[in-house]
Amino acid sequence: YYNADDEWVLRKHIELFIHAGLDFIAFDTTNARIYDSQVYTFLDLLLEYKQQGFEVPKVMFMTSVDVGDSKTTVQLIYDAFYDPSMHEEYEELWFRGNRNKPWIIGSKTGDSVTDSYFYFKLPQWPNAAIQSSKFPWIDWNYPQDIYKDAQLGNVMSVSVSQHVGLMGKSNGTYADFSDSGLFAPENRAELTGKGFSFSEEYIEKVYNANWGRGYDHATKQNSRARALEGTNFEQQWKTVLDREKDGEASNDIGLVFVTGWNEWIAQKQANSRILGDKYCHFVDTFNMEFSRDIEMNAEYLDNYYLSLVRNIRAYKGVASAAAYSESEDCSGLMNNLDGWNSASAAVYRDFSGETIARNAVDTSGQSELVNVTGRNDIREIRVMSDAEKIYMLVRTEENITPHAAGDTHWMNVFLGIGGQTGGWQGLQYVLNKNPGKEKTSLHRMTNNSFDKIGECNYTVKGNVLRIEIDKKLLGISVADYTLKFKIADNLQKDFDVADLYVSGDTAPLGRMSYVYRAAAK
């Protein structure tokens, strides 16, 4: 487990948040810890990306439902991060709804300066009587309840899974996430082997007492297989999207609060409700099926992140890619940088700072986490086309490292053509697997292998790579087409989705691609 002040990790998180279109994030300080060091690192990185010109998510904090704890924590948060006399640089990062005051989830402190500074929302706990003016971090009802806010209107919670068994909410059986996880089908033989004897009916009740990642509200059943599909999460989003589609403006959801990205605390507590005082239990996080993180994981990879992105786009809407007409003749672009400033050039910006070396300790403080694969920091890509060819320019922060013999992961350019099938992750071609002095290779990806189909002209000068691609090699025979692409430098593995997130630099990060849409004049 990494430490939450690992800058290498936090940079990845921020980039993913920006790509997802998140408007704000909330730090969970409900356990009365405010994570000073980690939050400062995160805020400073947000400022760095904002200064690069990116729309970064805003920030707020969520405190305890306990009034006394909340008052203390709110004051600590104000003093540590918000006090304008101490931290004026962070003022532009605070989430303010559609008014002027920064939001905070918690109780007023009694301090006039602090209380007049914030816009307060009291936290709604899922096992308490519903008060519609409060703020829901999770909802134990399905379909989820509607909450109200004077600024943003209807508010709704969307969560990955719900620990409703904590209060017997689901079927009258009191069970923690760990109880449901231990009573899952794959673990029942081990329970029997330890001398436990429960009826099949009771085992099923405990397993389904909580709503795991694969819980289906139609059948009221959990499923580990469905957990990889995110059935529960998708049904939660469906509640939001159905209200958006019904045509009634009064039903529109003004704010969706998603729980959650990750759990910074996974408490191991004594005395299992089901197995007795010889056994511990875990309330919020237990295993893949009974946990609520969206952040990437070795089992479900980026499934939940991409589901989040897709549903945010369905909720907020997304503009179509701009269409670019062919230029008369782009052949001069290979020798002249000025031509790339044309209005007919499509421009795609990537984050700077992604290639820092990782040399951190894990959360135990015992093991080092090292990643030194960062090499060429991709900053910008430009695309233009004429009747016969597509031209790409890739600009990096520093001079591009020379290609070393045998390096098949140097400045790879992955391409996908709309309407074509096969390949990998919607991409059918890759450039620069075997570049020469003046020409570079073009390979087609088929069945997790690379088949060379041609060569393309290319040049490298300083921090600029330019490539000229014959459309015929890509099977393009019309003026209207869609080109998907991504740039990756120094991947460590071929055909490995996880490697797109952790090795070298990829633009854009992870499984996503940029889109260039060409249109006839």
Q: What is each residue range found by the language model?
A:
Residues 379-382, 453-458:
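Beta-strand-rich interaction surfaces with strong enrichment in secreted/lumenal proteins
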Residues 17, 263, 392, 413, ...:
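Residue-level detector of buried hydrophobic side-chain packing
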Residues 513-521:
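Mature N-terminal, pre-catalytic/accessory segment of carbohydrate-active enzymes
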Residues 1-330, 408, 452-454, 461, ...:
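Glycan-processing catalytic domains of CAZymes
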Residues 444-454:
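Short beta-strand and strand-turn-strand segments in soluble, beta-rich domains
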Residues 460-506:
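Ser/Thr/Pro-rich, low-complexity mucin-like regions
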Residues 329-441, 489-498:
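Surface-exposed, glycine/proline- and aromatic-rich loop segments on solvent-exposed faces
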Residues 55-57, 61-84, 349-366, 434-446:
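Short, basic/low-complexity N-terminal boundary segments at the transition from targeting/disordered tails
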